[in-house]
């Protein structure tokens, strides 16, 4: 079953689903700055575009481009800066 989610007044939209027992979501973020909370560990992969990310425990912002991925621990939060619409894939670990 597909779960459609909308965050930040419609600036971030995602579709969540299960594939072979794994929870995943795909989505698009419009330009802006966002803070996301995590319940479970996540692996984010940039599909198209780029994002600047400040992960928990990191002082510096990191830039991730299409094809790059990064992990975020569960029960934490991370900040994202988007300069132009960016597509992503999120795997819940």
UniProtKB/Swiss-Prot annotation:
Keywords: Glycosyltransferase, Transferase. This is Pyrimidine/purine nucleoside phosphorylase. InterPro entries: Ppnp (IPR009664), RmlC-like_jellyroll (IPR014710), RmlC_Cupin_sf (IPR011051). The gene is ppnP. It comes from Photobacterium profundum (strain SS9). One of its GO terms (cellular component) is cytosol. Belongs to the nucleoside phosphorylase PpnP family. PANTHER family: PYRIMIDINE/PURINE NUCLEOSIDE PHOSPHORYLASE (PTHR36540), PYRIMIDINE_PURINE NUCLEOSIDE PHOSPHORYLASE (PTHR36540:SF1). One of its GO terms (molecular function) is guanosine phosphorylase activity. Disulfide bonds: none annotated. It catalyses: a purine D-ribonucleoside + phosphate = a purine nucleobase + alpha-D-ribose 1-phosphate; adenosine + phosphate = alpha-D-ribose 1-phosphate + adenine; cytidine + phosphate = cytosine + alpha-D-ribose 1-phosphate; guanosine + phosphate = alpha-D-ribose 1-phosphate + guanine. Pfam families: Ppnp. Its EC number is 2.4.2.1, 2.4.2.2. Catalyzes the phosphorolysis of diverse nucleosides, yielding D-ribose 1-phosphate and the respective free bases. Can use uridine, adenosine, guanosine, cytidine, thymidine, inosine and xanthosine as substrates. Also catalyzes the reverse reactions. It comes from the Bacteria.
